[in-house]
């Protein structure tokens, strides 16, 4: 099954998990799957609706969108082994930049969008101390993510940004130059096709990729019940090392980090 076929199935309404169901089934079958086969084995809620949407797709138009950026799928050799081992690994990823960075050792950095000066400085110091031995992976959000990417660049290191939009969408807009620079000189990844906007549920989905690419996750200024805390707890369940940076006990910004430290991070 080709990468475009995966993109088309998702465009017709299948979730990532449902696409994975199809790929696993197809792997064990020598014959090409019919549309009805795909609808059934995907376990989608409304097979008839999926098939109708699939048939209505304008292939010429969709292929133009698909070909705007290079991509790789879970079926390709370049797909990172660590990422393939997580729960619900992305079936398809679009990218800009140096794909070879995926083969190098990486550490993720996550944390608050509303970070403090102390939080940013803590991340900058740790990344400097790593001495460019690891690729810094983060989500290009405001706050800790931006501090992590910038620290990697300022110290002559390399960085990977995993974003929650299409590669042609800049969110936040303040990071447009940074995203463009990383895409040209380092690597930007997304499981969302061109034009896809920053929907709320995209960001926890993005976070699983950030953690999944790496054997370790550094977290700074995570509040309780924050997305960063959930990402770290999931990373721990996946067997990743989590390194929580302690912060002030006065403002609640690092309560999630302190919880992780109590749990053994």
Task: Tell me what each language-model feature is.
Residues 3, 74-265:
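Glycine-biased, small-residue-rich flexible motifs in mid-sequence functional cores and linkers
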Residues 1-128:
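Short, positively charged patches
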């Amino acid at each position: 099954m080709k990468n475009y076929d995966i993109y088309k199935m998702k465009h017709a309404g299948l979730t990532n998990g449902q696409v994975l169901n199809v790929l696993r089934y197809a792997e064990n079958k020598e014959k090409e799957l019919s549309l009805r086969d795909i609808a059934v084995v995907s376990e989608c809620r409304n097979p008839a609706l999926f098939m109708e949407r699939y048939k209505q797709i304008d292939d010429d138009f969709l292929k133009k969108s698909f070909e705007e950026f290079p991509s790789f799928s879970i079926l390709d050799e370049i797909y990172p082994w660590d990422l393939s081992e997580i729960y619900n690994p992305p079936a398809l990823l679009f990218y800009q930049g140096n794909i070879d960075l995926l083969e190098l050792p990486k550490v993720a950095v996550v944390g608050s969008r509303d970070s403090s000066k102390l939080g940013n400085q803590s991340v900058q110091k740790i990344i400097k101390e790593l001495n460019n031995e690891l690729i810094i992976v983060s989500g290009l959000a405001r706050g800790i993510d931006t501090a992590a990417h910038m620290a990697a660049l300022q110290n002559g290191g390399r960085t990977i940004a995993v974003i929650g939009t299409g590669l042609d969408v800049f969110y936040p807009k303040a990071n447009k130059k940074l995203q463009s620079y990383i895409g040209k000189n380092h690597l930007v990844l997304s499981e969302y096709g061109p034009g896809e906007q920053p929907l709320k549920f995209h960001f926890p989905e993005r976070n699983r990729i950030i953690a999944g690419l790496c054997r370790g996750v550094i977290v700074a200024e995570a509040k309780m019940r924050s997305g960063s805390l959930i990402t770290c707890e999931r990373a721990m369940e996946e067997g990743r090392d989590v390194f929580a940076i302690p912060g002030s006990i006065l403002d609640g910004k690092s309560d999630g980090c302190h919880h992780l430290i109590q749990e053994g991070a």
